[in-house]
Design a protein with these regions (language model features):
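Short, ordered loop/turn segments at secondary-structure junctions
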Residues: 148, 167, 196, 294, ...
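Glycine- and Gly-Pro-enriched alpha-helical subdomains that act as flexible
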Residues: 262, 275-278, 282, 288, ...
């Protein structure tokens, strides 16, 4: 075979081999793309996204859309060629797998975490909105989680309100920890709880709202968690996580299924305020979308996947987009045409921006582009 032909054949075979490798070789990346948006003032599946009972609510117009991203699963790994194609597209974000799914996390683990973050976000959204409106918000100490196989399993349940430990009233997490750890491992601790309504009514163990004393044996911390720090390893534990649950003078339900994560907090707060404000009509009929976590005091925090959320908002028809200040640098790298990015740090600031949008005085809006 002539040398030239042999060289061309070798080059062709090498190219084919490289193409095969690029198609078959998997790389540790995750792909994000624009997800659906939901109008917090509207309906989803025939039901209001935000429904209020026990208090007057008022008609609204326009849109206050929360935005989402779609993410490939924990087990998915794109081929090298698919990852390269994703890097070249504006509507796909390719990120290291561990940035989205910590090592060892399964789809079920991720779904559970996202659901917990979403529930926490809903709670903070209600709290921040009512504080903004001057409505009193209460709090109570609850069981947040029960460790599988722990002494508390089957005795205490997530959602139970903790009223006292060993007969002494408790109102903080630290008080519960102190009351349990003063025992020697093996000794019982008596929790006075108000069982969560679902368990109390369903099991017939107690009337909803009734107090009951629940004795729970203790074990050493290291018996439940071999990785417990040395200073805690020998302390008595029962295997629960505790936290604070807010209480409200009326019912605010957020009815979205199959949505997770904490990033809708700001938009939920705005939707709640709009529905509770007589004649408020925060948007003035405009299409506003946005994202951002929110804490109980109305502070807005950063989120992931901002570039994909901007595309989702633009495709849905949004004209304005609330953007957490910490996300502005990334967001301004590729702003979709016709979308105005409003820099946002607080719920109060977002409300002031809506007032400017409603009045048409948009030139002074705090913009990410400035």
């Amino acid at each position: 075979m002539p040398r030239r032909s042999a060289t061309m054949l070798a080059a062709t075979l090498l190219l084919i081999a490289l193409l095969c490798v690029s198609v078959l070789m998997k790389v540790p990346y995750t792909e994000m793309s624009p997800g659906p948006t939901y109008n917090t003032l509207g309906n989803q599946g025939g039901k209001p996204v935000i429904s209020i009972s026990g208090r007057d609510s008022y008609p609204t117009t326009g849109h206050l859309n929360m935005t989402t991203v779609q993410v490939t699963g924990a087990k998915y790994e794109p081929s090298l060629v698919n990852a390269v194609v994703g890097w070249l597209r504006d509507d796909v974000l390719v990120v290291p797998h561990d940035n989205v799914y910590p090592k060892g996390q399964s789809d079920a683990d991720a779904k559970k975490q996202n659901a917990e973050e979403f529930a926490s976000s809903e709670d903070s959204a209600r709290t921040a909105a009512l504080k903004q409106l001057g409505v009193p918000v209460g709090s109570e100490l609850i069981v947040k989680s029960v460790t599988a196989g722990a002494p508390a399993e089957g005795k205490l349940h997530a959602g139970d309100q903790i009223v006292a430990v060993d007969g002494a009233p408790v109102t903080t997490v630290d008080q519960v920890v102190a009351a349990v750890t003063r025992h020697k491992p093996g000794e019982p601790v008596v929790f006075t709880v108000v069982p969560r309504v679902k368990d109390a009514a369903g099991n017939g163990a107690a009337d909803p709202g009734a107090r009951t004393d629940v004795p729970v044996p203790t074990v050493r911390a290291k018996d439940l968690d071999p990785k417990a720090p040395a200073e805690r390893a020998e302390l008595a534990v029962v295997g629960i996580g505790t936290g604070i649950r807010h209480t409200y003078p009326f019912q605010i339900d957020i009815g979205l299924q199959d949505v997770g994560g904490p990033s809708a907090g700001l938009m939920f707060s705005l939707g709640i305020i709009d529905k509770l404000t007589p004649g408020g009509d925060l948007t003035g009929g405009k299409f506003v979308a946005g994202t951002g976590t929110i804490d109980d005091d109305g502070k807005v925090g950063p989120i992931g996947g901002i570039s994909m959320k901007l595309i989702a908002a633009r495709d849905a028809g949004a004209e304005y987009f609330f953007t957490p200040s910490s996300n502005c640098a990334e967001a301004t790298k590729n702003i979709p045409s016709g979308l105005n990015l409003i820099k946002t740090d607080t719920l109060d600031g977002a409300l002031k921006s809506l007032e400017q949008i409603r009045s048409g005085q948009t030139s002074a809006l705090p913009s990410c582009a400035k």
